Amino acid sequence: FPDAKIIVALRDPRDVCLSCYMQSFDLNQAMVNFLDLGSTTRLYAAVMDLWRHYRALLELDAFVYRYEDLIDDIEAMARRLLAFLGEPWDSTVLRYHEIAKKQYANTPSYQNVTLPIYRKAIGRWRSYAEQLAPHRNVLQPFLEEFGYK
């Protein structure tokens, strides 16, 4: 573990929270937090606060990127990620969706995993800005830190 390389994919916190809130998860102690936007945004903040705290405390070797930047140039981001991992470039990574179709992924978004990367979920929060507005103060520190307006 001390030499583990950590990969963190960021996404606009508003889109993350909205996506979790709108997902039909099987309820358990964690997923019950996604039944309303208030608890969803508070859980997001708690998790991201933990990440920031332990990254600094443990001096974790992390590759942090924004989903939106990946969408803009998947090959460049994949090259940077493989370099971070000390792995040679392999163009097969760009065909991840073809490989995923041959395997089972235990995720609520399985259908999306088997598709080429797409932009349609970026900025989806704008359609729900009014509903998210009461929770902006919870997300604001992360919006600023991660470069979202």
Predicted regions and their residues:
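PAPS-dependent sulfotransferases, especially Golgi type II membrane carbohydrate sulfotransferases
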Residues: 17-64, 72-149
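Conserved phosphate-donor/acceptor-positioning beta-strand/loop module used by diverse small-molecule
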Residues: 2-21
